[in-house]
Amino acid sequence: LRFSYPDGREALRGVTFAIAAGETVALVGPNGAGKSTLLWHLNGLLPGKAAAPLTAQGHSHGISLRPSRRLEPAVWVDGLAVDDRNGPEVRRRVGLLFQDPDDQLFSTTVLDDVAFGPLNLGHSKAEARRIALECLTRVDLADAAGRVPHHLSFGERKRVCLAGVLACEPSVLVLDEPTANMDPRGRRRFLDLIRGLECTKLIATHDLEMVLDLCGRALVLDAGRIVAEGAVADVLGDEAVMDAHGLEVPLSLKLGRTLS
């Protein structure tokens, strides 16, 4: 996958990877590496082009950006090509959670915000409200249904956004810095919610302790390229890789080595 912004800056330079259904994978890297840009391609917010022919073979229910001899769309998610033909269905299947909840919230009440997705999927107003209340209950915010979203705390707004994504019943969840700017209590609560979701998850983050806690595999993105991937402990514990790409080995891994 390749992508350049209108000013000519090449943000993605031949990114290739695959995530199997049900995996929880971390995307880590320094600021400006292209992490958010990559995430925005997974539900069609940004159009990309293939760096080489690609296929979805063998990854019909996950995320696939893999070389092939046949020319295919650059990104496949949950068995669908991410292109103009499949845009609405891709956006239903792929839930994208932005880093800043204020980029995602726009309605006058929490309930209306969470119900927006189901309404646009064709549900009746009554059914959309039922789904919204159910999802607000899942994130422990049912009592905030009638409140103005922007009057809530940062962590609460983040949970409203998660409820709005879950209301569309995605099979793939893409999260951009889900714990950024959260206090410890809000972070723990949000991580518990993410941990309990049974779907494919790709998490872009600088919170490497969270990666150790939640993820089975890690991808390192730097300067628009995947420069390392593998089991979380192997990747995050590789001092040479981490240092070369502006990252630090998590403290818990360092302490574990010292104690052993």
Residue ranges and their predicted role:
Residues 28-30:
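The feature captures the beta-strand-to-loop junction immediately N-terminal to the Walker
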Residues 43:
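Helix-to-loop junction immediately C-terminal to a conserved catalytic motif
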Residues 126-144:
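Conserved ABC ATPase "signature" region
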Residues 148-152, 156:
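Conserved ABC ATPase signature
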Residues 173-176:
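Catalytic Walker B motif of ABC-type/P-loop ATPase nucleotide-binding domains
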Residues 211-213:
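A short, surface-exposed alpha-helical micro-motif characterized by mixed small hydrophobic
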